[in-house]
């Protein structure tokens, strides 16, 4: 029997309808039950403030790690570092059940260094996906209840997939930049399913789990073509990136054991470690463009495609789930009144806005899961001109109240600290 999707998305110690609140690390969403969890929006507050665009963004003040080719747009003596975090506030509704949760997550740690003339190095850490869910449902079959008593089914999960990367980029001529990243995917995904019996038997709970250890290497290639026009007043940039798809290697540990009323294990039903983890991170293609007036404004658009349909995931009891191709369209704009104004601080602030539409890789109960939203952001100069506090807010919605789905509305706050310093400058005076 198919169950309404996550109809019992509530705290384990609560029951009935009404609003529930949860605090968590990483994420806490029913949709992270599927696949490798909730795919994190990539990019710093600079990118998110503009709807998430970055494929064709070139900026000598901030790090754009969405395209490795972009890091050649920099002062040849500059050291740059970007550290970010985010806070998510999600509000879920499923028929008459409402829930809310807050989650905190490290967003990125990225460093870029000059190498030689118009070439540069980039290295960093970025979360790719997060799992966080916890919900319960009772047994409703009267024959089973009459024989075994009240039974509750619990599902809960946690974990993440992250990437470490190192890359380089260089300019070829005056209008083309190319870059490459070497990527190490790693992490562990924990997915548990428990059955709890209310009868006073030796066995009170059967605990089952699947632990997925992620370990894989991949690569990402990027290019940007940029050319001035209209008497060099404006700059047109075309960008593209491609990430190689890879099996996420590692081990799968399947286990099941029984516990008594005190939680002590009384019997191991099975325990198996399989080194053939076939979960796959598919290839990703992204293209985009920007039109920019230097130090004044920029508009742009990105499109991203990822072929998740070729990836198979373990089934989810009671819910039809399959992976499908994901698409996203993002648009954004930024504006700086006068970045060199010495009298009025807010004229030096960069203001951003954007929007996006995403069709997720999740297809649940025969329906594609989509999300859309608007974003706002700004860069607040700190001390020196290129040091800044970057802020962004993402207001969106995914899912719906139709077809036994969960409607999820969210507000995500992102903060990044950008450090920009000059190295190897010989002082004029000792």
State each model region's role.
Residues 4-13:
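Sec-dependent N-terminal signal peptides
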Residues 15-19:
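Sec/Tat signal peptide C-region and signal peptidase I cleavage site
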Residues 20-430:
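Subset of outer-membrane beta-barrel
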């Amino acid at each position: 029997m198919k169950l309404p999707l996550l109809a019992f998305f509530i705290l384990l110690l609560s029951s009935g309808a009404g609003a529930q609140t949860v605090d968590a690390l990483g994420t806490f969403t029913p949709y992270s039950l599927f696949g490798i969890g909730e795919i994190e929006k990539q990019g710093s507050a600079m990118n998110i403030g503009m709807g998430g665009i970055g494929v064709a963004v070139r900026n000598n003040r901030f790090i754009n790690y969405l395209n490795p080719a972009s890091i050649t747009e920099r002062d040849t003596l500059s050291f740059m570092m970007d550290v970010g975090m985010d806070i998510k506030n999600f509000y879920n509704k499923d028929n008459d059940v409402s829930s809310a949760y807050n989650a905190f997550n490290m967003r990125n740690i990225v460093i870029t260094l000059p190498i030689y003339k118009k070439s540069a190095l980039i290295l960093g850490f970025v979360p790719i996906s997060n799992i966080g869910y916890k919900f319960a449902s009772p047994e409703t079959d009267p024959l089973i209840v009459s024989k075994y008593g009240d039974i509750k089914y619990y599902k809960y999960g946690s974990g993440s997939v992250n990437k470490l990367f190192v890359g380089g980029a260089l300019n070829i001529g005056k209008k083309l930049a190319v870059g490459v990243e070497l990527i190490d995917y790693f992490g562990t995904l924990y997915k548990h399913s428990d059955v709890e019996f209310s009868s006073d038997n030796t066995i009170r709970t059967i605990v089952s789990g699947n632990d997925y250890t992620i370990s894989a290497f991949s690569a990402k290639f990027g290019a940007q073509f940029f050319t001035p026009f209209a008497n060099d007043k404006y700059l047109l940039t075309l960008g593209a990136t491609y990430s190689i798809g890879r099996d996420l290697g590692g081990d799968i540990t399947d286990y099941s054991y029984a516990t008594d009323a005190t939680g002590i294990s009384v019997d191991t039903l099975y325990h198996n470690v399989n080194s053939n983890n076939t979960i796959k991170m598919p290839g990703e293609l992204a293209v985009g463009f920007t039109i920019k007036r230097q130090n004044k404004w920029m508009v742009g658009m990105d499109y991203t495609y990822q072929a998740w349909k070729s990836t198979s995931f373990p089934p989810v009891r009671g819910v039809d789930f399959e992976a499908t191709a994901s698409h996203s369209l993002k648009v954004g704009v930024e504006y700086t009144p006068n970045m060199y104004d010495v009298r009025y601080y807010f004229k030096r602030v960069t203001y951003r806005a954007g929007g996006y539409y995403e069709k997720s890789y999740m297809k649940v109960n025969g329906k594609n899961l989509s999300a859309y939203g608007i974003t706002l952001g700004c860069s607040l100069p700190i001390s020196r001109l290129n040091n800044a506090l970057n802020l962004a807010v993402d207001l969106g919605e995914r899912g719906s109240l139709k077809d036994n789905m969960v409607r999820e509305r969210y507000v995500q706050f992102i903060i990044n600290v950008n450090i920009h310093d000059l190295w190897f400058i010989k002082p004029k005076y000792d």
